[in-house]
Amino acid sequence: MLSPKRNRFRKQHRGRMKGISYRGNRICFGRYALQALEPAWITSRQIEAGRRAMTRNVRRGGKIWVRIFPDKPVTVRPTETRMGSGKGSPEYWVAVVKPGRILYEMSGVAENIARKAISIAASKMPIKTQFIISG
């Protein structure tokens, strides 16, 4: 599972996901990519599940790049706890994804294989996505 090695603060505000992604919205490394069409928090487990699905599908042929990293801690309060008495403890990490962001990139395989692998990874994501080709 992906998570930061060290971070300055244990807890973070939730924040807002306004607008579109101006960074990380172009294909940089591979030939094929999966692009987000909706804003969402994507957990480190979902990122890992998508990566595994793609890796299993392309086997040895292709190379895969994960373009998002979960750097936001999400806190959860224990169940049946009364209101107040501070913020909960950090449970898991999420990547804040805005529309237009590239999630995964791939190269070194045929288009039909890449399309199949990326569609399987897309089914693991909690948002609408699209398959794009560079060039």
From Swiss-Prot:
GO terms for CC? chloroplast; mitochondrial large ribosomal subunit
Question: What CDD domains does UniProt report for this protein, alphabetically?
Answer: Ribosomal_L16_L10e
Q: List the InterPro entries hit by this protein, alphabetically.
A: Ribosomal_uL16, Ribosomal_uL16_bact-type, Ribosomal_uL16_CS, Ribosomal_uL16_dom, Ribosomal_uL16_sf
The answer on whether this UniProt entry bears the keyword Ribonucleoprotein reads yes
What are the BP-aspect GO terms? mitochondrial translation
Gene3D superfamilies assigned: Ribosomal protein L10e/L16
Q: Which GO terms describe its molecular function?
A: rRNA binding; structural constituent of ribosome
Instruction: List keywords of the entry alphabetically.
Output: Chloroplast, Plastid, Ribonucleoprotein, Ribosomal protein
Highest taxon above the source species: Eukaryota
- Quote the SUPFAM superfamilies the UniProt record gives: Ribosomal protein L16p/L10e
The main place the protein resides is: plastid
Query: Carries keyword Ribosomal protein?
Result: yes
Subcellular location(s) of the protein: Plastid, Chloroplast
NCBIfam families noted in UniProt:
rplP_bact (TIGR01164)
User: Matching PANTHER family, A to Z?
Assistant: 50S/60S RIBOSOMAL PROTEIN L16, LARGE RIBOSOMAL SUBUNIT PROTEIN UL16M
- Cite the HAMAP family for this sequence: Ribosomal_uL16 (MF_01342)
Q: Which family does it belong to?
A: Belongs to the universal ribosomal protein uL16 family.
Tell me the protein's name: Large ribosomal subunit protein uL16c
